[in-house]
Design a protein with these regions (language model features):
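Glycine-rich phosphate/adenosyl-contacting loop at the front of the ribokinase-like
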Residues: 1-74, 110-115
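Conserved N-terminal subdomain of the carbohydrate kinase-like
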Residues: 48, 52-126
Length: 126
């Protein structure tokens, strides 16, 4: 069916794109989550891939699903949930250049995928 099926988080990474005149960061919203990034790389190398996960039924969730679809990743296993928001990650750099993450999730959709939802997608064989 697929070469690789990934299960995990899909979220939006807000990264510093620039700074305004007062020195405050201007943030850019980027599709994120290691499983989706991994699948996009595999898809680029010719593998067939699919994603299992949950996002909010919001603009960011739609952005994530659309981004995966534009890369050829099967998204039938992604649940869009109107009861929770897509998780947001704010990525900053410390004084040594290492990334630091702060998450906005109370709870985030990525933490709410149930076993039944994952299995109902029909992407995993027993």
């Amino acid at each position: 069916m697929f070469d690789v099926v990934a299960l995990g988080e899909l979220l939006i990474d807000f990264t510093c794109a620039s700074k305004d005149e007062a020195g405050y960061p201007t943030l850019a919203a980027n599709p994120g989550g290691a499983p989706g990034n991994f699948l996009a790389a595999l898809q680029a190398y010719g593998c067939t891939t699919a994603m299992l996960g949950k996002v909010g039924a919001d603009a960011f969730g739609k952005l994530l699903v659309g981004t995966l679809e534009s890369r050829g990743i099967d998204t039938r296993g992604i649940v869009m949930d109107s009861d929770v928001f897509t998780t947001l990650a704010f990525v900053t750099l410390d004084d040594t250049g290492n990334r630091e993450f702060s998450f906005a999730r109370k709870p985030g959709a990525d933490t709410r995928l149930t076993e039944a939802e994952a299995l109902d997608a029909g992407l995993i064989d027993d």
